[in-house]
Amino acid sequence: MTLLIRDVPQTERPRERFIREGAKALSNQEIVAILLRTGTKQSSALHVASTLLSQFPTLAMFSEAPLEEIQKVPGIGMAKAIELSAAIELGRRIQRETKLVRPVISSPEDAAELVSEDMRGLQQEHFVALYLNTKNHVIKQKTLFIGSLNASIVHPREVFKEALQSSSASVICLHNHPSGDPSPSPEDISVTKRLRQAGAILGIELLDHIIVGDGCFISLKERGFFATIS
């Protein structure tokens, strides 16, 4: 039998938990249930939210789903599908607006945090470069390559062409591992070596190469790889 919202203790209902503990304490299911507001006669908003999220392996895939796909979930009509899509779009706009303020990169954590949300749930490797000025402000962020990264795909020419065009003082490169494990591969080390060497010739330092996993990351510089590939 499906649990209805009235069967959930009042203190454990999503809205009450939101008020008491804040949004960050809630699960994805609870956040979606709040946006849905109501369920059906047979299913609570929590159950509808659970069914919806089960249709999409990742939040990134859900965020890209067309209205027609969202409406296939029992309990979600056109109005609720539009409300969910509007909430997602608002989140995107907030993120874009935030990025208009040039962030300062003072640690690998800063760089990883800047791209981790965009990389979450991606099914292919994405290679991103952050171009910095002399004060380590990000003046440009660009996805340069998509696919299985190796030395033949990630060419220093493309990385540093953007650096020269934007008059960057340094570059930080990042890419994701869809497996969720950020451990560097031999190809990652090889690519980093070529980029370090090219940057040294051009006078544009590669400050770091960061691999982003599932809720974690590895800085090749912090792990000591830069000392062996100078």
Swiss-Prot record:
Pfam families: RadC, UPF0758_N. InterPro entries: MPN, RadC_JAB, RuvA_2-like, UPF0758, UPF0758_CS, UPF0758_N. One of its GO terms (biological process) is proteolysis. Transmembrane segments: none annotated. Keywords: Hydrolase, Metal-binding, Metalloprotease, Protease, Zinc. Residues 104-226 form the MPN domain. A motif (JAMM motif) lies at residues 175-188. Zn(2+) binds at H175, H177, D188. The keyword Zinc applies. One of its GO terms (molecular function) is metal ion binding. Belongs to the UPF0758 family. This is UPF0758 protein ABC2615. It comes from Shouchella clausii (strain KSM-K16) (Alkalihalobacillus clausii). The lineage of its organism: Bacteria, Bacillati, Bacillota, Bacilli, Bacillales.
